[in-house]
Amino acid sequence: MWRRIEAHPKAWDMIVVGGGATGVGVAIDAAARGYAVLLLEQSDFGKGTSSRSTKLAHGGLRYLEQGNIGLVMEALKERGLLLENAPHIVHDLAFVLPNYDWWEAPFYGLGLKLYQLLAGKYGFGTSRILSREETLAHLPTLKTEGLRGGAVYYDGQFDDARLLIHMVATAFEQGATLLNYVEVTGLTKDAHGFVDGVTARDVETGNEFRAVAKVVVNATGAFSDLLRLKAEPSAAPMIVPSQGIHLVFEASFLQGESAIMVPHTRDGRVLFAIPWHGHTLVGTTDTPIGAATLEPVAMEQEIEFILATAGQYLTKAPTRDDVLSVFAGVRPLVRATGVTSGAVSTAALSRDHVIHIDRSGLVTVCGGKWTTYRHMAEDCVDQAATLAQLPEKPCVTHHLHIHGFHDEAKEEAAKEFGALAVHGSDAYEIRKLIETDAGLGEPLHAALPYVKAEVIWAARHEMARTVEDTLARRTRALFLNARAALAMAPAVADLMASELGWDEATRTKQLAAFRDVAANYVLHP
């Protein structure tokens, strides 16, 4: 891992601030065109919104209902490209809409056919109406009282943090330089008042430095306005943050390989119950919040809402005692042009991406969704390169394979590598670690599939710098079972200490920091 940016006092074509899906996507796109790219992330890659999604690569049925055909078509195309470029992480999944009223089958069936039609050659499967028996075959734990049947359609599912880490590796392979735990403390300007670089601080060492670039891209998501204010103190806010939470349960709450999709909840959102890494993931909510934080906390009313709504559809109504983990994320929704203050309905805010260029030349890319990160990046790099008068070069990411790509089908990879299959082609190298030292094949916890070799791999090759990085984003232990993650933490700290050279004081500090974060993922009775 390369931590010393000071040793490379070069002028960059582009500096990207923010290491989530959007920022890393921009770094991949720009580097693949041949531009010199530096990306700086104040915390870990995906620490914010990008690791806290509903884990869906989808077009968005709700946007279709709202009449946003353009967004749906764009997302369906990008969904198809995601599956093509990262089949080791993205896969198709059957979603069932249970029908309890006579009108639901024809109504939703028609909408799903349109959704399928809009996907064109990027379609994932054929939607159809299901009988009552077929619906229960898909969803054995669905409540049967009043059930008439259902409708099934196919969308994409993925592991968001795992995909992001492989995108980071892809950006490196294309020639970009990316650093986590480097905070941008300010923007620098030339004699004409145009942004020409950043000042930054290495969080680990405290070292400060300046980096110069022809253009700076603000890809800080929910925190976009904070960086914009450094460029233009009078800048009007663009972002209206909204919080969504998810609850995680044992797989027994949703037996089988299909997901439930509830098209209308009482807060106007869609609710999903999804099989994910051997567990059941249920969410989400849409709660306006005053300001974004790196570690948002689920509100009681959100927790109760999901428990109550899930209980309306599942034969065994989940309770607080059943929750293995609860996590919250912040959506960086974009305020409508000309609206600068006042209460705004989150349902009315834009889910489209926006690229804004301040008078000082700071390029801000925000909004959008995980599925469309590649298209957002293409659009952003096009505009940033034009602004900076960089040599015109076409986007090449449409068919650029993400790191870890291999041709094996999901089922074949799972047979060969088991839980290591999520690492794609890296699974071969992780298996070599185990072959060299059998002890590295030992599981870290009986309730989760992770082994010691994955910790070593994360520290050596995936820029994991903290216990939290490993347990939250290199593995998904914290998101799947918070108590199990807490139990694993000492062993993870020991392994990372040996790899990263921590002394006992650092190890102790790391464990304390992780326990503080993990406390918000544990739901108490």
Language model feature labels by segment:
Residues V16-V17, A211-G221:
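Short hydrophobic core segments
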